[in-house]
């Protein structure tokens, strides 16, 4: 698959990234996308938790997908071995149906991660930002922890994600 695109980046380089900094990066990307397009975008968010929480979740996903993996696409078979979290990002309709019943990461978050996870929607609600929680949103890179997001054009919905990012430490 070939793609051509323009991109920009904004990163906070810090040893301790707090919730405010994470939300600042999200709001910067959201505002930039809306300014560039001239209209609202759809913001989808998820929370991947710490590395420890994510490892527990990966184990649960492996157990869930094990009975299904033989009937899944080749990408999902590879992802099952390498990183089962990425199966949630599969675009094959039959595999998406299986993913609907997969465990949710929020059930595998540590107590500390649970607190941070609960603060994100509250903070966005407090400032009036519209968003959708998408349990299947995992992003393509393994270094993300905590909040992840993708932005979609609300008018030209065939584009797929027009932006994305998240927290990594």
PLM feature spans:
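TRNA-recognition modules of translation machinery and tRNA-sensing kinases, especially anticodon-binding
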Residues: 1-169
């Amino acid at each position: 698959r070939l793609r051509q695109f323009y991109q920009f980046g904004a990163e906070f380089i810090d040893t301790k990234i707090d919730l405010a900094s994470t939300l600042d990066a999200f709001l910067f990307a959201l505002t930039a996308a809306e300014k560039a397009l001239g209209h609202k975008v759809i913001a989808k968010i998820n929370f991947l938790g710490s590395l420890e929480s994510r490892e527990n979740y990966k184990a649960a996903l492996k157990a869930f997908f094990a009975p299904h993996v033989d009937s899944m696409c080749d990408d999902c078979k590879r992802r099952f071995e390498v990183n089962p979290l990425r199966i949630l990002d599969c675009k094959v309709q039959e595999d998406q149906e299986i993913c609907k019943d997969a465990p949710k990461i929020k059930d595998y978050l540590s107590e500390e991660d649970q607190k941070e996870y609960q603060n994100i929607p509250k903070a966005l609600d407090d400032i009036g930002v519209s968003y959708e929680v998408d349990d299947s949103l995992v992003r393509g890179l393994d270094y993300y922890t905590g909040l992840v997001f993708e932005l979609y054009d609300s008018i030209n919905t065939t584009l797929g994600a027009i932006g994305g990012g998240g927290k990594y430490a």
